């Protein structure tokens, strides 16, 4: 990349490169061309829009994306997801350029646990180890003994001695589920994902009445009553594998962010997937699916501009990076 590209003040204010693009450009083709020129790969989370998943070199959940980031040969990674995922890429491949198409793509779950609060909590609980969900900032990971994703949380926790004292955060629902299946009593941080917290048992029951044959799949970030009525509980990758491995099932009710429907429908074209609508407050107007507005900040235009101008890049300071990478590497070695 030409390091001399002037990063404009307005880009910094907006958090992304906002430059006009010729309307006649075939953005998908141009993005692939830029990837070739810059030796870049595009990593996309299942919750991004379908057209981004279609042009990505690799689509996956947090665990698969972390693995890919650790092993890629490419000089540049464009992380189409949210900010903590781009940080994870940078931690695992510090010598690579990591682009995040829109720096505003945060995460309500990562925001629910501030490093200074966790540091204080750790000091109040000597003798406890910290296990953090991957949906956390690098600064929180630096205070962590081991990281988990929803795809490997049980496996990682099972590797700790049964009498180990553990603080688990920031996702209360995931921690509560892991406590219930492992018989542990981990101390749980009270954080949550604003998308998964909106799923209700009532909405699932209503869909189940309309589609009695459908199998209910729910993400582990959902509340306990929702998980209690689900037939399949797990990460997005768990849901995808289950649907692929059970061709006899023709209908599913899905309680997770709606972006996963793209990959589910692509892999299982003869199956019908019903997204659970979010719970609406009294008098509110509901929509048919539950979306993460942060994931949806990623767009073809922003990806094109980030590749063209080599910005926004994600950096992690060396002091934090040296401590933050250890718990991620520990997780990868365990899973």
Regions inferred by a protein language model and the residue ranges of each:
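Short, positively charged and aromatic/hydrophobic N-terminal segments
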Residues: 1-3
